[in-house]
A protein has these predicted regions:
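Ferredoxin-type iron-sulfur electron-transfer modules in oxidoreductases and energy-metabolism complexes
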Residues: 32-38, 42-91, 95-191
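A surface-exposed, charged beta-strand/loop segment in the N-terminal or early-internal portion
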Residues: 12-40
């Protein structure tokens, strides 16, 4: 929800559901609105439909290749920096504040967080580029706007997800475009 014109309200790093009424003065008039974005249609009152985020997640926000059983996970080394970054990205709660704050209603911060938290660990590597392509394509299909990197999304994110994840996702997306779809490349070309 938007409280007094700010996604999630007046406090940085705090979601609406964690905002206490005691943070407002007695007698204050508070204006509460739903998120406003084409991809988040209003259902009624303060309820908006965020199923577009679910469809983006379903497009590739998972690991489907066999990566070993539970004991095997302990034998796969994950560099500390990657582990920390993956955990930072995994904090995204998919609330939609990034979309609500963006002048273009872009979902890049959400998608970047979901792509990065899987792409930074060894288990996510086999599908890394396929995942980013599928999720960005689904984001575009859902009608979210283009990112112009103004940073308004980062400023209102209750989990303080960094814009750096968008840069990381853009690099992975560029690689996915260069690599192309192996099915389309096979048998073609000038060779």
């Amino acid at each position: 929800m938007v409280i007094d014109g700010k996604p999630h309200g007046p406090h940085k790093g705090v979601a609406t559901c964690q905002t206490y009424m005691r943070s407002f003065s007695n007698g204050d008039e508070i204006v509460i609105e739903p998120w406003r974005a084409k991809a988040f249609p209003i259902v009624k009152d303060l309820v908006c439909d965020r199923k577009s985020f679910d469809r983006i997640q379903q497009a590739g926000g998972f690991i489907s290749v066999r990566t070993g059983s539970a004991p095997d996970a302990n034998s796969v080394p994950v560099p500390k920096e990657n582990s920390d970054l993956a955990m930072d990205a995994a904090q995204c709660i998919g609330c939609g504040a990034c979309v609500a704050a963006c002048k273009n209603a872009s979902a890049m911060l959400f998608v970047a967080a979901k792509v990065s938290h899987l792409g930074l660990v060894p288990q996510g590597q086999p599908e890394r580029y396929k995942r980013v392509k599928a999720m960005v394509d689904q984001m575009d299909t859902e009608g979210f706007g283009a990112c112009t990197v103004t940073g308004s999304c980062e400023a209102v994110c209750p989990k303080e997800i960094s814009l750096d994840f968008i840069a990381r996702m853009n690099r992975d997306y560029a690689v996915s475009l260069i690599q192309g779809d192996p099915k389309q490349v096979a048998g073609g070309g000038a060779g």
